[in-house]
Amino acid sequence: MRPIRYLLLTLSCLLPLALSAQRTRPDILVQIYVKGLRTDLLDSYRAGWGGNGLNGVMKQGTVAPDIRYPYPLLDEVARLASLSAGAMPEIHGVYQAERYDAVTQRSESTFANRDYRGINSTEQLAPAGALRSELLTDVLRGSSQGDAIVYAIASRANDAIAVAGHDAEGAIWIDKHSGWWATTNFYGGLPALALKANNEQRMLGGRTTPTVWKPLSKSTKEGSFAHTFEGAWRMSDLLTSPFANDAITDLSKEFIRYAHKARRTSPTLIVMVLDLEVGARGVAYADYSPEQQDAYARLNEQVHQITALLQELYGADHYALNIVGVPVANLAQPKAPSRRSVVTFDPAKCIALANLYLSAIYGRNDWVMAYSHQTLHLNKKEIADKKVDMQDMSNNLATFVSEMEGVIGAIPAYQLQRGLSQPAWAKPLYSHSYRSYAGDVLLALAPFAEVAGEKPGVEQQRQRHVTAPFILMAPGVASQRLTEPISYDAVAPSLAYLLCVPQPMSADGTPLFILFNQK
């Protein structure tokens, strides 16, 4: 009898644990990447927001203060692809939003593809040839044999494609010239809901977009402002205003309603990419400016709209919401008074002097063709025709440009590709070295260096580390605030675990099981 009693006692102790370990797969996951969302600013602004929106999500779910990467990623498109794939750029292939084409000698989208055409867009884009890895979107569509509803919606084409992958039903973005919802025929046609929104003028700049940006709150403690959208900067300023996020939120809500009516047996995944880097005429508004505070307040309202709709349609135990902060710096930074000396790196001067130096060694020629994204591009055709040692020239070029104003150091790309010993300043350049079009010699610029002809302050802002949160609210996910950053490669596996699908093939990380420890 005693062994039986011990067995029954053990089972009675384990039963609550077994029940607490049970979790329900959500019918829908809405994943919101928020470019420019910072943990410090979020914690500062949300004190006066009340219990709905982001405060409600953070209270009910798990919050991590930051996302850790093995080396710095200075481009938000590379971050989006890395988070979605669970792998770094040398695996998934997307290291920055733009690449330099040595043939045409100009920069173009990293997803540029002449085999496809844009719909409501002049851009010819596709993930094919650029994105080499499987994303969470691809896994969900594949494991459901095409039954799952999967869409990605963003304000920029690169962002939408970077999170949609190859097999999403659609990647939808805002055309930067017209404001219309656009896509590429790689995904087929423009989804009917986006087409309907265009026809009803429910796109950026349409009848639903305000003509003046005023504070959402009537309280004047943050400061009052009124910005109009007109003239040559109209669409550009709209894209860097909170109204672009409003348009994405409104269209995403239509896809959520569509998914609920469709009642598929597989879970739905709607991926949104919002942007908090607000500005006007290409210049960002400063931290704690009334405009930035209003953008955060509007994000809170957008999250509230999404959660309220999910609660209404699906109920608390049948939906999941994931919010991921992504550092970004695309707009020129506002000028601030400072006593520090700012040095200027001049790419044109660098190329001219480098060609004189290399011509003295290898014969007169334009050996250096161009500069882009802290990278010098060599004339590979001339190097091959003249039978010059490419590595020898790269080494000489790196040694020479290291002495130029505004440059901390320079390193040939092949040294990074081979994993050779490298100084600490070269780490941010690591992800730039894995493509044939990525260039030949990579430059690390001084912290306060400005690049002649480029937006002031952008490079410095990209190199500055900021904390970006990870938030997950879902059935079976614990309500907790973590004190340590999570690894980037745990995001996709954790969401795959939540949806009960395999994690992306290139993802080596494991799910964050601490998320699912109910108490």
Each language-model region and where it sits:
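Bacterial N-terminal signal peptides
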Residues: 8-16
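His/Asp/Glu-rich, glycine-adjacent segments
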Residues: 87-266, 275-282, 403-406
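Secreted, luminal/periplasmic, and some membrane-associated catalytic domains
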Residues: 34, 49, 65, 73-75, ...
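A long, amphipathic alpha-helix that forms part
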Residues: 49, 238-264, 277-319
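Short, structured active-site-proximal loop/turn typified by the sulfatase FGly-forming signature C/S-X-P-X-R
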Residues: 42-92, 149-151
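Short, solvent-exposed turn/loop segments enriched in Gly/Ser/Thr/Pro and often Arg
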Residues: 64-84, 151-160, 273-275, 325, ...
